[in-house]
From Swiss-Prot:
PANTHER family in alphabetical order: GLUCOSE-1-PHOSPHATE ADENYLYLTRANSFERASE, GLUCOSE-1-PHOSPHATE ADENYLYLTRANSFERASE-RELATED
Binding site for alpha-D-glucose 1-phosphate: 98, 163, 178-179, 189
Pfam families per UniProt: Hexapep_GlmU, NTP_transferase
Subunit and interaction comment: Homotetramer.
HAMAP family associated with the record: GlgC
Coiled coil feature spans: none
UniProt EC number: 2.7.7.27
Keywords of this entry: ATP-binding, Carbohydrate metabolism, Glycogen biosynthesis, Glycogen metabolism, Nucleotide-binding, Nucleotidyltransferase, Transferase
Role of this protein: Involved in the biosynthesis of ADP-glucose, a building block required for the elongation reactions to produce glycogen. Catalyzes the reaction between ATP and alpha-D-glucose 1-phosphate (G1P) to produce pyrophosphate and ADP-Glc.
Swiss-Prot/TrEMBL catalytic activity: alpha-D-glucose 1-phosphate + ATP + H(+) = ADP-alpha-D-glucose + diphosphate
Protein name, UniProt field: Glucose-1-phosphate adenylyltransferase
């Protein structure tokens, strides 16, 4: 079977990332100094020789759609094939919103027909990993499967966060449960599937006509295939690097893994490059007397202070006498002089004044949303302005577009938060 079409699910809201995803879809979140999350899935496609790609957008699609454009950075600006943005649409039977992952693909069966799909690769646009999809496809064809799911073993205490499967000795999936409270296995789905098109079309039409379905692959379609013995599903075990950066802690950790002496995720492999759409900027500048250690510093950055174990994105400016430790500083953020920042995530275009201390003090639970803002990280939303001489504790959150007038005093205790005042 030949023609493979990739469908990238890129409509996720990413609520566990808090202020980072209030204005952008999760796949558009910046990562690794210059990329956005979707770049890794798109690059995996073209590195695997897959040039027919649909990107299914939904929540806050503007930044993502602008980033992808016509696909030129990924060599996807093609007359035959290429990349196409596929938002929800109003049709005879469709709503104007994807009802679930399965419904999103169902609404675009016509796109698959137009591209003469024989195999359909269904991918998530918000994970960090490098995978040659041909290995998955070859395994799928070898097993003569109707569908194949990429998976990996995870610690059993984390298994309830994933779709969990049980297989026989031949790798055939015999049971699947989405995010079970008491997992019976630690073999977790990576949200990467390949299906024979005609089989997929049949089960999606049946699922769409099921009034009791939530139209989700993990919750509905896959369990039903197994329960009703509609076809054969196999598990493809992946042993490479894969991260779900769906929480602030996991996002921060995955970024800082990039600066390890031997990083588990290799951005520098000449045989498996990652492509992105990025602004042209001059080389990074590190001023005399500054110190940069165990960090990524991207083009356009100007460092006049000291940076340790951090990821510094494009166009960031760090003032004299400032120390940045264990932090992620996103594009065009500006940090003034004589500041101290530790264990912080600073979003795009934030301006921090002089003599600001952030990520210091006692540990405390966050008062805004302790389930989202945890792990003792302080997070600042895009376009915010932090005034001079502020002392901001651990586990704090500064909302999007916060200004100096929104701060009641020069001290923000650990666990506290500031959001913009309503007009």
């Amino acid at each position: 079977m030949g023609n493979t079409v990739a469908m990238i699910l890129a409509g996720g809201q990413g609520t566990r990332l808090g202020v980072l995803t209030e204005r952008v879809a999760k796949p558009a979140i910046p990562f690794g100094g210059k990329y956005r999350l979707i770049d890794f899935t798109l690059s995996n496609c073209v590195n695997s020789g897959i040039y027919r790609v649909g990107v299914l957008t939904q929540y806050r699609p503007h930044v993502l759609s602008k980033h992808i454009g016509i696909g030129r950075p990924w060599d996807l600006d093609r007359k035959d094939g290429g990349v196409e943005i596929l938002p929800p649409y109003v049709g005879r039977h469709e709503s104007d919103w994807y009802k679930g992952t399965a419904n999103a693909v169902y609404q675009n069966l016509e796109f698959l027909e137009e591209n003469d799909a024989e195999l359909v690769l269904i991918l998530s646009g918000d994970h960090v990993y490098a995978m040659n999809y041909n290995d998955l496809i070859d395994y799928h064809l070898l097993k003569e499967a109707d569908g194949t799911i990429a998976c990996m073993e995870v610690p059993i205490e984390e298994a309830s966060r994933f779709g969990i499967m049980i297989t026989n000795v031949d790798g055939k999936i015999v049971d699947f449960e989405e995010k079970p409270a008491k997992p019976r296995s630690n073999l977790a789905s990576l949200g990467i599937y390949v299906f024979n098109y005609e089989f997929l079309k049949k089960v999606l039409i049946e699922d769409e006509n099921d009034p009791n379905s939530s139209h989700d692959f993990g919750k509905d379609v896959i369990p039903r295939i197994l329960r009703e013995n509609l076809g054969s599903l196999y598990a493809f075990r992946f042993d490479g690097y894969w991260r779900d950066v769906g929480t602030l802690r996991s996002y921060w950790e995955a970024n800082l893994e990039l600066v390890l002496p031997v990083p588990p995720f290799n951005l520098y492999d000449p045989n498996w490059r990652f492509f992105t759409h990025t602004e042209e900027m001059p080389p990074a500048y590190v001023a005399p007397g500054s110190k940069v250690s165990t960090s990524l510093v991207s083009e356009g950055a100007e460092v006049y202070g000291n940076v340790f174990n951090s990821v510094i994105f494009q166009g960031v400016k760090i003032g004299r006498g400032t120390v940045v430790k264990n932090s992620v500083i996103m594009t065009r953020a500006e940090i003034g002089e004589n500041c101290y920042l530790e264990n912080v995530i600073i979003a795009e275009s934030v301006k921090i004044g002089n003599n600001v201390r952030m990520g210091v003090g006692e540990d405390a639970e966050n008062k805004l949303d302790p389930k989202v803002y945890s792990g003792l990280l302080t997070v600042v939303g895009m376009n915010s302005v932090i005034p001079d001489d502020m002392v901001i504790g651990k586990n704090c959150v500064i909302g999007i577009g916060v200004g100096p007038e929104d701060f009641k005093s020069k001290t923000l205790e650990s666990g506290d938060y500031v959001i913009p005042r309503e007009e």
